[in-house]
Amino acid sequence: MKKLLAGVFAGAMLFWSVGANAAEDHYKVKLVAGSPGYDHIEPFMAELKGFWKKYGVDVDFIGGNYIRSNQMMSVGDYDVGYNQFASAIRYNAAGVDNVIVGASSANCALVVANPAIKSWADLKGKRFGIVTKFDAQYMTLVHEILPRFGLSAKDVNLALVPVPETASAILTGDVAAAFPFEPYGSFAVQKGAKLLLPANDMIDKKHLDTDMLRNGIVMRRKFMQEHPDLARKIMWAHMDAVEVMRQHPDEGIDVIKHFNPKIDESLIKESYKNCGWEYQKAPKVWIDTLIKWMKQDGILQKDVTYDQVTDYSLQEGYPGYPGWEKHGK
């Protein structure tokens, strides 16, 4: 009888051990992001500070180009991406398996102008530099900022200007004004450009109770369904990085410096002030507004709703930074 019980016990232990090992998910997560600026800093911080390793997640990470990040997520090559919200919404409406799961920095951009520009009215008929068309920043400009100051997109000549060239384009008169993301707006101001609209005034909050959020973390639903534990840990590592940026700015600035050694440290610190870190989720009013603007511009293949393009369920239970210590693996 003892031998029988011992055999049963040994078999049960073997079954439990195999089951436990089978429960461990060793899938290598494919993650893509743009360049290591404030909008996409979270995965670079997670890699540099070892957040993913502390959560026990193996990540194949590439970064460096936001256009490539958008493209790779649009064709399903990667599980997780740091993308423009407008792109994520547009891809979702086109049937791509992308959903917004978290937010990044807020505002983090300036409107700058040639010193000869005295008022917004002076911009009528002039060239106005933008990063690209139909992203969240472009739509904020044409649907929110220009109308607030008595202009429309037809009143200015919108021109694509590479953000690193903003200062020279402004000061040489190639464009009268521009709307670059940070730190290039602050750099232009340092070089003599006029600050026409500060970061915290991107949105008139008397009429729209939100900030401008351009980028965030996006996941494929298929990945979330097939690897829920890994998806949650990737999400929490992102949330940890946002909390570091909010609570410990010097640590966040050090990460920016590490990946951008040629950028003046004072510029990095100055531009940090123009980026908000209050959001782990993009507000419903903001996503609804982006969808409304995109419908007006005719760039959605079908109607979509906030609930269809967002899923914040992975954020549930987040214990705060550092998540890996408070929850364990």
Locations of the language-model features?
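Bacterial N-terminal signal peptides
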Residues: G7-W16
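Bilobed "Venus flytrap"/periplasmic-binding protein-like clamshell domains
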Residues: D25-K49, I62, L110, W120-Q190, ...
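Alpha-to-beta junction loops
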Residues: V57-D58, S74-N83, G95-N98, K126-G129, ...
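Pocket-lining segment of extracytoplasmic ligand-binding domains
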Residues: A86-S87, E165-A169, V175-K257
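Hydrophobic/proline-rich hinge and linker segments of small-molecule sensing/allosteric domains
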Residues: I100-S119, T210-R221, Q225
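Secondary-structure end/capping motifs
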Residues: Q225-Q301
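Conserved C-terminal helix/tail region of periplasmic/extracytoplasmic solute-binding proteins
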Residues: K295-K329
